[in-house]
């Protein structure tokens, strides 16, 4: 025969069976009112959702003719903020293409050297040693002349700068002399003017 259950055991057994977790919204009236008055936090989408029929049509068009590319925007149209760059003092950033050197139209020396050096690749095919040495000698001469011209340009620039500084110094010197002469003239005029006689009183 099974042992007899106590009343407390029976009560706990029945309680465990019927226990349920009920939400406060259903049990508490004030909580229910709070939920009812709560505004919609998520904004309603401004873009209208397409119907299934329209979407199907669009998909069919894409399959037939391909998808259209969206509008391409330039960088200045996108309003991208420009970042602050660190400026290194005394270093000027080079502009333009890297390693690009422009040749003047009247610079026949450089142009002829370039033409000769470019034609090298095609002349090598059938030329004698004598022709090759002559061509290389011409190239060397042209390069030498170019270097001499560059040196001359540097010297001219230096001389020009020197003369400019000398002229500036001489102009400053002449200005100083003029100012000194003018000041001396004013002083002389002031001394030449007769001073007014002042009455002197003597006490015996």
Swiss-Prot record:
UniProt keyword list: Coiled coil, mRNA transport, Nucleus, Ribosome biogenesis, Transport
Membrane-crossing ranges are none
What are the recorded GO MF terms, alphabetically? mRNA binding
List, as start-end ranges, the regions of compositional bias called Basic residues: 7-16, 174-183
Where is this chain's protein located in or outside the cell?
Answer: Nucleus, Nucleolus
Record carries keyword Disulfide bond: no
Q: How does it assemble?
A: Component of the 66S pre-ribosomal particle.
Which protein, by its recorded name, is this? 60S ribosomal subunit assembly/export protein LOC1
